Amino acid sequence: APELSDLNVVMSGRGYMPMRLTHWKAEWMQKSGSFDWEYPQWPGMECDGRKWCREELLDFYKPWKEMADAGNIVHIGECGCYNKVSNETALAWYKDFFSVMNELNFGYALWNFRGPFGIAEHGREGTNWEVKNGIKFDKDLYKLFVEGMKK
């Protein structure tokens, strides 16, 4: 929203694009067709008039980057990939998403730490788990998350 750029505010957005990947088979999205969507691939899935990949994520966040370039702080206050897609697909999406956030210098936060969008106990099959203090962590997602915060 360029009309807001001179207000010197923190802008908070969401990190769920493309929704057909991040919310595939999400129960609360069933009326929107989440159970009927084709299985999402990353990169390369086609929806919303785009062939999604890292470059499309950069393009999607271009208006937010313009806000940041105008002197505003941008924070993607919720993001993540629901646990119904394969771990391989989720990790590929997270890798690109985190790298885009890092490149744009945007802060971000996962929807949850522990649970279906989180780093801990999300329940995706094929996960490389590590247990610390009784909590199951996705080692690969944790590594991507930490690397994504580095410049």
Residue ranges and their predicted role:
Residues 86-151:
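Aromatic-rich peripheral "rim/lid" segments of glycoside hydrolase catalytic domains that contact
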Residues 1-104:
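Extracellular glycoside hydrolase catalytic/binding regions
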